[in-house]
Structure formats: structure tokens, C-alpha cells
Amino acid sequence: AGTENVPAIAGLAAALAQADANLPANTARCLDLRQRLTERLLAIPGTHLNGDAAQRLPGNVNITFDGVEAETLLLLLDEAGICASAGSACSAGAVEPSHVLLALGLTPAQAKSTLRLTLDAANTAEEIDTAAAVITACVQRLRDGVR
């Protein structure tokens, strides 16, 4: 089906080799950043980490803020330049609470108060601290009844 794109194939092989070589360092960095973010968010009263604290993807934080509608929180975060989601990537925009969160034992109200944050090794500690501060302020604002 034609001539193979040898330069692209070679480039892909080089990129995969580099990604594989960087995987241990990138994973360690993500774990450190995830821990930093998780600690800061769990300092907010009425906040709960969903799932096992250790057995999760290195760049995944799934957290519930009691009494805060995630969709409203997402609007405030978007205005502040913070990217987050109220559910899995494949269910973004769904009205029903996440069946996965319900299976983990969350109530429908808790599932609708849950935020998913992802990060990678390119994120900085400063970005994590900024995101945590913005999320903290937005959660407090919503709990105080200010929209």
C-alpha cells in the first residue's frame, strides 16, 4: 500500500525510546507532585480523596468537596485558568453521577461534588501550589454561598 514513511517510523522509534528511558524519572516526579497537591487539597475541611491513596495513576487526583457542586466549581476554576473535570474523560458533561464513584461507595451527592485533576511531569511545584490555592479559595467561596 505504497512506500513506507521511513523517517516517520524512525522518528517514532526514537521518541518511544526516549519516553521509555524517561519513564522512571517522570513517574517519580508525578508522584511527588500528586502528593503535594493531595496534601494541600485534603487540608480543606470536608474534603475526601477517592480511591486508594497509593494504588492509582501517578498523575491522578480524584477528590470530593462536601457541599460543593462540581459543575459550579469547574466554572470558577475555568475562569481562574485551572483545568479540571467533574468525571472521567469518557463521561465529561454527563448529568448522572459517575457509576465508578458510586461503586466506590460515594453517595450521588458526593459523586456530584467530585473533581478529577490530572498532572504530568511537565507541571511545576509552583503550578501545583497555585492550583491548590485557587481551588481552596473557590471551594470556600461556594461554601460561603458566593457564586
PLM regions with names:
Residues A1, N26, N62, A89, ...:
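Glycine- and other small-residue-rich loops at beta-strand/loop junctions that grip anionic moieties
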Residues A1-A19, N26-L33:
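PLP-dependent aminotransferase class I/II
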Residues N5, L16, L37, F65-G67, ...:
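Glycine-rich beta-alpha junction loops
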Residues V6-A17, T38, L42, L74, ...:
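Predominant activation on well-ordered alpha-helical scaffold segments within soluble catalytic domains
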Residues L16-L23, L41, P45, G81, ...:
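Structural signal for hydrophobic packing residues in well-ordered secondary-structure cores
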Residues D20-L73, E79:
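Conserved PLP-dependent catalytic core of the aminotransferase class-I/II
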Residues G59-R116:
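Conserved C-terminal alpha-helix-loop-beta "cap" of PLP-dependent enzymes
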Residues A92, E96-R147:
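PLP-dependent enzyme catalytic core of the Aspartate aminotransferase-like
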